[in-house]
Amino acid sequence: MKNILIISSSPRKKGNSQILCEQFQKGAEAKGYQVNIVRIMEKNIGFCRACDGCMRNGGTCVLKDDMAEILEMFQKADVLVLATPVYFFGISAQMKTFIDRTYPIWQHLGKKEVYYIISAGLGEDIIERSLGDLDGFVEHLEEYRIAGK
């Protein structure tokens, strides 16, 4: 059974990208997959300080917040879903913070299948920019497959 982790970076509980996450979850659970949604706005996640403390501490960040729990879920997941609204022509600040905080483990994640959920109101070119942001992160994972590419 596949273990799916959805990272929802919408700051709005009933925002469009959050609704899409919930629909993805329903469909995956109907197929028998285990699904966890992490709503970043409901977690205490500090900004990366670029101190390299995690590199000196065997991959453990010096910040004591909810990110350690999320990274553990991230490592165990077979499938990763990154969901973001587009704000001011790019991924949400919450998604960027999440990506930055994966620094201690991003090179040691193993094989992942990755999906994106991006919601925007301004058109396809705006979504393309956000795809570039997410691709820049995912393409540096150890072993990945972006679904649909």
Give the role of each language-model region.
Residues 94, 106-148:
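Short, glycine-/small-residue-rich phosphate/pyrophosphate-handling segment
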